[in-house]
Structure formats: structure tokens, C-alpha cells
């Protein structure tokens, strides 16, 4: 199997293709990307027959920015007979996947494909039973085995393949299913909530998103991101010249600082989180984030970078490289991840976690 399907936001196929071509090439897994505008997916076709599995095994999925999900596939199955779509699919997967732990029958995130969603849900149950009978799936779901993917691009037309549970998105179609909280000040709250699900393992939430932590929200008005921090019982300094939602102020957990987020400097040294969703040029935001991290003003940060109209992958890569260079120069060891989230539009969300730093002659364990 030499093809890898990458699901992405419709309209960002070129960025997804540029990224996978770049990062696969750096691992000497060469191929070319098949791109269809606004399709919501890209197919990276490797030149060597076994390189598809090698790619999804060796390249960390967490290192990808524009892909929501990925899986290796074989040839396209076309003209599936309406009276029996299951048999050809089972035949394609037998001998390819043995004892998969989960089945996902998926589509691209486009209006055209959404017409297939109802069919996919109904089709999953009988297909799962047939795959279990054939030994392609285990008799029970398990996260320790590969995930089997059946990806419909049109009625009676699908790719079949698999991904590795330890190196994929745990979410169906790569999209966390979140509900907008009715008491949140703005829909932007879903961006930060999704970022927390994507970047922080669930079993680490109690430690890294703990009650009583101190946090800063730069460019906070009206409080969509502050809302997520308050919901997790943090004390929040919300920095913005614009007003905060009264419902947040009434909690007693929010201190509104009427200042410019680019000029604000914290006056305490125990800030766990800094979040930022300001409409500004990516380079300016990245420089500010580097300043916070280099100076140890926070332990973790999540921030958004607004994208230009052209060369968006190059722009993000340049800013992430600058951030990494600044951290390296100042002896800060950190983990950096970036992802275009489902709730992002013309932007990407970046998460940075300081691990430790040598600052002013002392080792600062973080």
C-alpha cells in the first residue's frame, strides 16, 4: 500500500500537500501529492510500494499542522454494487489488516460528502460484523490495535486502509465533537477547548489544567478563551482594552487589566498558562510568545497565528522555526506543536510547553 490519505480543512489542500511532501521528503520517503481543490483531503502517493505504511509509522502525526487525520490505503474501490458493498471491502482488507481494534467509516468534511454521512453511520454496523467474522477486526474495540478506515469519496466509491492508534487522531474524521456552551461569551471558546483536547493527553488534564492555577489571556475581550480557563477553576488575568463579559467578572476568578496585550508584563512568577488569540501579523505574535517563554513568564501557552492569503505553510514554518531558534538560543527546552483545528479558519493554533530552562545561571526546572 503506497498511498496515504490526509484529511484537512476544505480550501487548505495545497498547504496539506506542501507539508506532507516536505516532511516525507526529509525522511527520504519520496512521492507526490494528488490535490483536488476544496475536496477536504489529499492523497500522498509514495514511489515505493511499502512506503505508505512506513510514513504513517515513522513520521509523528503530532508534527503535522494541516492534516486532521491520516491513514494508508490501497487502490480506490469503485462501482460497489448496492446489493452487496460489504464483500469487496472485506476482500480489500483481508491480508492487509489483522485484528484491527476499531472501525471508522468516514467522509471528507465537505457539504457534498455530508450527504453520505447518514449512509456511513448505518453501514458501519453490518460492515463491522463482517470484518470481525473475517478476522480483520477484533471482537471488541481496543486502542492497542490498528484503526481500520473506510473512506467514502462518493456513493459506491471508497478507499480502505488503516492507521496506527498510537500515531493518529483519536477522533472520528479527526474532529473532536464539542458542544457550544450557552453561557460562553463567544464561539471562539471552542477553539481553545479543541486545542486542549488535541494538545494535552486526557490523563494529564488534572495535573496540567489544575484547580487554582494562575493564567493570563492576552487580547481577551469578550472572554471566549477566558471562559475555558474559568471553567477549570483557574484565576485569570484577562488583558484587553475592550470589556469582558459580566458573567465572567461575576465569578470572582477574573481580573480585567485594561492594557494592550503586547505591552503587558506579568507581575507574578507562578503563571501556569498564557493564552492569546489576537488579530495581528504572525511574526509579531510569535515574537511576543518567544519573549514570554524565554523569560519564563508562563509554563505553557496556546496561541493563534493568523494566516496570509498565500504561502501559508511557508509562513507558519518560518514562524515556528524562529520560535524554536529563540528557545534554543536562550537554553529553553520546550515542546512545540501546531495544528489547524476544526474551529480555526484562516489560522493555526500553536501549543508550547516549557520543560526546563537555564536562566541567569540557574537551572529552572519546569
UniProtKB/Swiss-Prot annotation:
Keyword field contains S-adenosyl-L-methionine: yes
Binding site for S-adenosyl-L-methionine: 188, 221-224, 240, 260, 277
Enzymatic class: transferase
Catalytic activity: cytidine(2498) in 23S rRNA + S-adenosyl-L-methionine = 2'-O-methylcytidine(2498) in 23S rRNA + S-adenosyl-L-homocysteine + H(+)
GO MF annotations, alphabetized: S-adenosylmethionine-dependent methyltransferase activity
EC number(s) reported in the record: 2.1.1.186
GO cellular component, one term: cytoplasm
Active site as annotated: 306 (proton acceptor)
Keywords on record: Cytoplasm, Methyltransferase, rRNA processing, S-adenosyl-L-methionine, Transferase
InterPro entries reported in the protein's UniProt record: RlmM_FDX, RlmM_THUMP-like, RNA_MeTrfase_FtsJ_dom, rRNA_MeTrfase_M, SAM-dependent_MTases_sf
Biological processes, Gene Ontology terms: methylation; rRNA processing
Gene3D superfamilies xrefs: 3.30.2300.20, 3.30.70.2810, Vaccinia Virus protein VP39 (3.40.50.150)
Keyword Transport: no
Pfam hit, one: FtsJ
Family statement: Belongs to the class I-like SAM-binding methyltransferase superfamily. RNA methyltransferase RlmE family. RlmM subfamily.
The protein's assembly and partners: Monomer.
Functional description taken from the UniProt entry: Catalyzes the 2'-O-methylation at nucleotide C2498 in 23S rRNA.
Protein name in UniProt: Ribosomal RNA large subunit methyltransferase M
Gene: rlmM
Amino acid at each position: 500500500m503506497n498511498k496515504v490519505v490526509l484529511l484537512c480543512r476544505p480550501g487548505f489542500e495545497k498547504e496539506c500537500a506542501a507539508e506532507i511532501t516536505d516532511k516525507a521528503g526529509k525522511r527520504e520517503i519520496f512521492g507526490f501529492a494528488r490535490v483536488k481543490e476544496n475536496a477536504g483531503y489529499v492523497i500522498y502517493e509514495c514511489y515505493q510500494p511499502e512506503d505508505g505504511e512506513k510514513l504513517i509509522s515513522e513520521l509523528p502525526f503530532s508534527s503535522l499542522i494541516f492534516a486532521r487525520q491520516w491513514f494508508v490505503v490501497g487502490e480506490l474501490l469503485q462501482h460497489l454494487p448496492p446489493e452487496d458493498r460489504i464483500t469487496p471491502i472485506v476482500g480489500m482488507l483481508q491480508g492487509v489488516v489483522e485484528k484491527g481494534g476499531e472501525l471508522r467509516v468516514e467522509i471528507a468534511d465537505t457539504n457534498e460528502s455530508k450527504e453520505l454521512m447518514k449512509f456511513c453511520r448505518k453501514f458501519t454496523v453490518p460492515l463491522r460484523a463482517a470484518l470481525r467474522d473475517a478476522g480483520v477486526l477484533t471482537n471488541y474495540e481496543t486502542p492497542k490495535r490498528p484503526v481500520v478506515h473506510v473512506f467514502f469519496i462518493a456513493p459506491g466509491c471508497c478507499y480502505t486502509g488503516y492507521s496506527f492508534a498510537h500515531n493518529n487522531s483519536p477522533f472520528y474524521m479527526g474532529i473532536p465533537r464539542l458542544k457550544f456552551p450557552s453561557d460562553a461569551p463567544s464561539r471562539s471558546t471552542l477553539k481553545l477547548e479543541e486545542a486542549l483536547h488535541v494538545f494535552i493527553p486526557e490523563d494529564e488534564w488534572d495535573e496540567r489544567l489544575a484547580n487554582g492555577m494562575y493564567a493570563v489571556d492576552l487580547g481577551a475581550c469578550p472572554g471566549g478563551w477566558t471562559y475555558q480557563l474559568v471553567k477549570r477553576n483557574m484565576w485569570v488575568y484577562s488583558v484587553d482594552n475592550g470589556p469582558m463579559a459580566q458573567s465572567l467578572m461575576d465569578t470572582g476568578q477574573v481580573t480585567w487589566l485594561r492594557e494592550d496585550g503586547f505591552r503587558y508584563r506579568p507581575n507574578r512568577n507562578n503563571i501556569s498558562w498564557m493564552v492569546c488569540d489576537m488579530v495581528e501579523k504572525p511574526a509579531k505574535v510569535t515574537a511576543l510568545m518567544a519573549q514570554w517563554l524565554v523569560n519564563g513568564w508562563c509554563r505553557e501557552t496556546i496561541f493563534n497565528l493568523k494566516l496570509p492569503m498565500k504561502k501559508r505553510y511557508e509562513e507558519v514554518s518560518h514562524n515556528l522555526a524562529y520560535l524554536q531558534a529563540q528557545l534554543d538560543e536562550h537554553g529553553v527546552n520546550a515542546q512545540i506543536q501546531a495544528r489547524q483545528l476544526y474551529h480555526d479558519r484562516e489560522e493555526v493554533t500553536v501549543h508550547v510547553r516549557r520543560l526546563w530552562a537555564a536562566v541567569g545561571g540557574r537551572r529552572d526546572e519546569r
